[in-house]
């Protein structure tokens, strides 16, 4: 963890918005009327996916990918003006939330302002042409961090935005030198000492692939030196395997236990069921009670919770990044009430809890514990919504299920799970 990371981040919730698809208008100002609803979910930070102009050369789809950035220092005119953006940030702040923007510093679009002004800042392949160090992406070209002039340009850009916003979600942060992030963090701290830094670290297999091809890829442990929290892609592949029925639940929970063993006690992973790069969880989990269990487990896990806009409506369609594809708020159930209750439960947890995970593979039950400073919480999550008797680490007695205030009985060390999620506070 960064030396000055705010421990309160552990129990906060980030809500991710893609401006183009959040409303039918697709503008900064059109987001504003929805802010009260978003705040009421228990949102602490709004993360706006890339707000900058999008490249045209090699673009994907009709409108291009927002991660093919054409100008780091401007806003996408399709979303509005800089004044419109500033108005949105003010309204976010007025509701007690922070605003985080996307930082895409691994690459730009081929027709970017930066490439036009400083072609020397870009990686060139064996043919001498700008391109990609790994893979072949038509809509982006990679930056070359061996040029220190690039470091200064990007750092100055971050300082500019840090005077307006409260944090940065840094795309493919593992492929950018950690020393650059440390320099940038120090410079930003001079104008915004409370800035929140979120790293999109890469999937374990992708990081290994990069290294096999001689491409720099920092480990999650290295990235933590400069960041407050980072993606949980180090365990995501195992989670996806469980969703597809390829491995038992215990494999995923063992991966969570490995995180607990190999990171500092106050490590903070961004926990999510879905994001703009991952399929909607509702497209995998069709049983509504099972989906409630997954959602409750998400909030119980150690780390900051991420909600991707539309998740609260059980959307099963992942919106396109490249075309107009507004969120449909009429699909599935409205989980807003559940999310509010889970947020209230999350506020009871410690900021550097110990965490323990066990599994009942026969019944697909996740048996989790966390605690600190004399507090201990037990969570039972039935990921296939099965009813089963399960042994729990809690004294016999009647407990309050913190999720819905119902009574839960433990007798002879056994809790009778009805298929609904349970979180209780235990002694010791």
In which residue ranges do the predicted regions lie?
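Carbohydrate-interacting/catalytic domains
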Residues: 1-47, 53, 86, 90-92, ...
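Substrate-binding/active-site clefts of carbohydrate-active enzymes
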Residues: 2-15, 19-44, 50-162, 183-192, ...
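Hydrophobic faces of well-ordered beta-strands that scaffold small-molecule active sites
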Residues: 13-15, 46-48, 99-101, 168, ...
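Soluble or luminal CAZymes and related metallo-dependent hydrolases
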Residues: 27-30, 80-84, 149-153, 176, ...
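Short, solvent-exposed turn/loop segments enriched in Gly/Ser/Thr/Pro and often Arg
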Residues: 47-60, 102-111, 171-177, 200-204, ...
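Short, surface-exposed connector motifs at secondary-structure boundaries
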Residues: 162-169
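Active-site-proximal helices and loops of the catalytic beta/alpha 8
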Residues: 171-264, 269, 297, 316-350, ...
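Active-site clefts of carbohydrate-active enzymes
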Residues: 263-286
């Amino acid at each position: 963890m960064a030396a000055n990371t705010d421990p309160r981040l552990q129990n906060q919730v980030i809500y991710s918005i893609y401006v183009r698809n959040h409303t039918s208008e697709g503008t900064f100002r059109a987001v504003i009327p929805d802010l009260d609803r978003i705040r009421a979910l228990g949102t602490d930070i709004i993360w706006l996916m890339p707000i900058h102009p999008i490249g045209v050369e090699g673009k994907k789809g009709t409108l291009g990918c927002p991660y093919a950035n054409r100008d780091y220092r401007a806003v996408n005119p399709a979303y509005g003006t800089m004044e419109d953006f500033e108005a949105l940030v003010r309204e976010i702040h007025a509701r007690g939330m922070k605003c985080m923007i996307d930082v895409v510093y691994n690459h730009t679009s081929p027709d970017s302002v930066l490439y036009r002004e400083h072609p020397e800042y870009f990686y060139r392949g064996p043919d001498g042409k700008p391109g990609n160090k790994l893979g072949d992406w038509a809509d982006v070209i990679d930056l070359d961090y061996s040029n220190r002039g690039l470091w200064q340009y990007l750092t100055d850009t971050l300082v500019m935005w840090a005077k307006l916003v409260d944090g940065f979600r840094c795309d493919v942060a593992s492929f950018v030198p950690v020393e650059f992030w440390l320099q940038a963090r120090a410079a930003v701290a001079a104008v915004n000492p409370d800035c929140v830094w979120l790293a999109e670290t890469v999937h374990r297999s992708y990081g290994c692939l990069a290294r096999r091809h001689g491409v720099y890829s920092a480990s999650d442990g290295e990235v933590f030196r400069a960041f407050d929290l980072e993606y949980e892609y180090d365990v995501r592949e195992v989670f996806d395997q469980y969703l597809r029925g390829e491995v038992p639940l215990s494999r995923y929970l063992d991966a969570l236990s490995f995180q607990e063993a190999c990171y500092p006690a106050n490590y903070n992973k961004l926990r999510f069921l879905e994001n703009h790069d991952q399929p909607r969880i509702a497209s995998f989990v069709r049983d509504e009670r099972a989906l409630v269990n997954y959602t409750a487990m998400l909030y119980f896990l150690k780390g900051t919770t991420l909600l991707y806009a539309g998740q609260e409506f059980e959307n099963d369609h992942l919106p396109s990044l490249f075309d107009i594809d507004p969120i449909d708020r009429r699909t599935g159930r409205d989980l807003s009430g559940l999310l509010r209750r889970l947020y209230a439960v999350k506020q009871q947890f410690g900021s550097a809890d110990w965490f323990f995970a066990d599994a009942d593979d026969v019944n697909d039950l996740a048996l989790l514990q966390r605690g600190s400073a004399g507090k201990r919480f037990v969570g039972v999550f039935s990921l296939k919504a099965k009813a089963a008797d399960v042994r729990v680490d809690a004294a016999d007695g009647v407990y309050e299920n913190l999720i819905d205030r119902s009574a839960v009985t433990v007798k002879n060390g056994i809790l009778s799970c009805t298929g609904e999620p349970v979180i209780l506070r235990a002694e010791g």
